[in-house]
Amino acid sequence: VLMMADGLGLELDELTVESEVELATEDISIAAGLVPQGTVAAQRWEWCGVAYGRDVIRLEAIYKVHKSVAPQWQSPAWVCTIEGSPRLHFEADKWTTNGLVGTAMRAFHAIPAVVNAPAGVRTFLDLPLIAGANVVQQ
């Protein structure tokens, strides 16, 4: 959220963070092993960047060990919604495959920019990416 605000040329008044967990109601066997009953089987996180008295950037992340856990939370997916003019909305329902491919593509295509960058720690904002600076209206 902080890097998105920076890329938008936006100074946040506040950053809020909320989280909650769901426990396994029974033993769950997954590829990585056993998730015992009573242990954390899902997490929901939400970060909100507040400016001009309203949430201007909101990021929600839901992690589940199995799709049957925490049915009240949205199923794992990649969803991006930009409320603006025009409004943009994108959903990728094959969250594991698309998420892994999306992450790998981002890293793969960054190689030339990272190689050509000065030595040191860099963020996506330091590399030649397009950012919509100064587009959040008061």
Segments from the language model and where they lie:
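C-terminal helical cap and adjacent loop that interface with cofactors, partners, or active-site loops
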Residues: 66-138
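Active-site-lining helix/loop region of Rossmann-like oxidoreductase modules
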Residues: 1-70, 76-78, 97
